[in-house]
Amino acid sequence: MSGGKYVDSEGHLYTVPIREQGNIYKPNNKAMADELSEKQVYDAHTKEIDLVNRDPKHLNDDVVKIDFEDVIAEPEGTHSFDGIWKASFTTFTVTKYWFYRLLSALFGIPMALVWGIYFAILSFLHIWAVVPCIKSFLIEIQCISRVYSIYVHTVCDPLFEAVGKIFSNVRINLQKEI
């Protein structure tokens, strides 16, 4: 063997047989071994979560960011007492904050369980039912498309070409009468 080529007993030059190159699990060639060692394994179960930025993809920017000023506003000329306004602001903000925490504590884990099961079922159905169904449909539709293509080329093309030639000499003259 020389330079990644294989010379047989009769002097013919071939590429190196696949067994001598190794396989994807135990490569013999250094380039493939380096390529595999550079890939980092990323496991979704062991990744760390960010406790500060809990919406890194900004899913709820336009929905959940509701402040006191977004809900309650007093126009000019109809203001309540300043103390009432401050107490209303504090009551609204604290109630929203703690009631959200209470609901999260009571229903957060059960809802996470429900949504985890739902998306697991959805992923399972997509992987094991939807994609194979679409692939089988595409394989089956190829036969129909070939028959349809033959039909179009043998029947429709000559028919429409003949009709086109018949009407190709039709001329329309428009004259405006005064």
From Swiss-Prot:
Residues 105-125 dip into the membrane without crossing it. Signal peptide: none annotated. One of its GO terms (molecular function) is peptidase activator activity. Residues 82-94 are annotated as: Interaction with CAVIN3. This is Caveolin-1. GO terms for cellular component: acrosomal membrane; caveola; caveolar macromolecular signaling complex; cell cortex; cilium; endoplasmic reticulum; endosome; focal adhesion. Keywords: Acetylation, Cell membrane, Golgi apparatus, Isopeptide bond, Lipoprotein, Membrane, Palmitate, Phosphoprotein, Ubl conjugation. It is found in: Golgi apparatus membrane; Cell membrane; Membrane, Caveola; Membrane raft. It comes from Papio anubis (Olive baboon). PANTHER family: CAVEOLIN, CAVEOLIN-1. A lipid is attached at residues 133, 143, 156 (S-palmitoyl cysteine). The modification Phosphoserine is found at residues 2, 9, 37. Residues 131-142, 167-178 are annotated as: Interacts with SPRY1, SPRY2, SPRY3 and SPRY4.
